[in-house]
UniProtKB/Swiss-Prot annotation:
SUPFAM superfamilies: Homeodomain-like (SSF46689)
Designated name of the protein: DNA-binding protein Fis
Annotation: DNA-binding region: 74-93
Membership in a protein family: Belongs to the transcriptional regulatory Fis family.
Gene that this polypeptide is encoded by: fis
Length: 98
């Protein structure tokens, strides 16, 4: 029998290694690796608005998946995300998801 455990405190990413084994690692590790790669590509150049760039990269797919999960129910989506429904509507509009 398979057992699925959900830890609401840690988001994980499933990865497949060269031996086709699936492993789970915290999402923050993937974000950290993506940022390391990004900084390596900058080659010492300065960057502006990094916070907004990273936030947009995470926020848009988060909104998309939550809206899919709630079947478009904005009240339920806002509750899941812990934000006000008006804030959710603004964010959806920002990304053209309204």
């Amino acid at each position: 029998m398979f057992e699925q455990r959900v830890n609401s405190d840690v988001l994980t990413v499933a990865t497949v290694n060269s031996q086709d084994q699936v492993t789970q690692k915290p999402l923050r590790d993937s974000v950290k690796q993506a940022l390391k790669n990004y900084f390596a590509q900058l080659n010492g150049q300065d960057v502006n608005d990094l916070y907004e760039l990273v936030l947009a990269e995470v926020e848009q797919p988060l909104l998309d998946m939550v809206m899919q999960y709630t079947r478009g129910n904005q009240t339920r989506a806002a509750l899941m995300m812990g934000i006000n429904r008006g804030t959710l509507r603004k964010k959806l509009k920002k990304y053209g998801m309204n």
